[in-house]
Each structure stands twice: as C-alpha cells, then as structure tokens.
Amino acid sequence: MNIPLGEKVMLDIVAMFRQYSGDDGRMDMPGLVNLMKENFPNFLSGCEKSDMDYLSNALEKKDDNKDKKVNYSEFLSLLGDITIDHHKIMHGVAPCSGGSQ
C-alpha cells in the first residue's frame, strides 16, 4: 500500500511520540530531552539551545495543565513552534531570532 507523504509524516509523528512517552500517554522531562536530542539535533545546535534550560522552559511553556508532563496535544504545539522556526529560517530569518514571517 502506497501511503501519501502527508499521512506518513503524521504516522511517524505519532510513532515518535509513543516511543518516548510513558504508559500514561504523556512524556516527562527525560523523555522530552531524549526525543529532542535524538530527533532534532540540528534545531538544538542551530539555536544554541542544546542545554537543559531550553528544554525545561519548553516543557514548562507547553505543559498547559502543569503536571510536569507533555501530552500529545502539548507535544504537537512544541512541534509547531519548531516548524515555524524552520519556516522562518527558509525565509532568511536568523535561527531563533524571534523575527516574523
């Protein structure tokens, strides 16, 4: 069966989240750190954000219910931020500069 690219990307995102989340379907800080370092090393190094403070802040910002874990919806919000930053870079904005596009 030929899976269209968009569907494959979505299925891969779901699988990535499940790989790093716990049995409760949520991801704690160690899981988020591992996921980011293993799957987004260029983003982290390009933004010079590979330190724990950035990841702690990302978890805190996206943790809407303040349970110190990221559910799937919160995780998608984080991925949205990363995707927006990559889009800005494609339009000549410096990585993580906060510029608009």
Curated annotation (Swiss-Prot):
Keywords: Calcium, Metal-binding, Repeat, Zinc
Gene Ontology cellular component list: cytoplasm; extracellular space
Residues the record lists as binding Ca(2+): 63, 65, 67, 69, 74
Example of a GO MF term: calcium ion binding
Residues in coiled coil: none
Gene3D superfamilies: EF-hand
UniProt KW Zinc keyword: yes
Domain EF-hand: 13-48, 50-85
GO biological process, any: endothelial cell migration
Top-level taxon of origin: Eukaryota
Family: Belongs to the S-100 family.
Protein name as it appears in the record: Protein S100-A7-like 2
Organism annotation: Homo sapiens (Human)
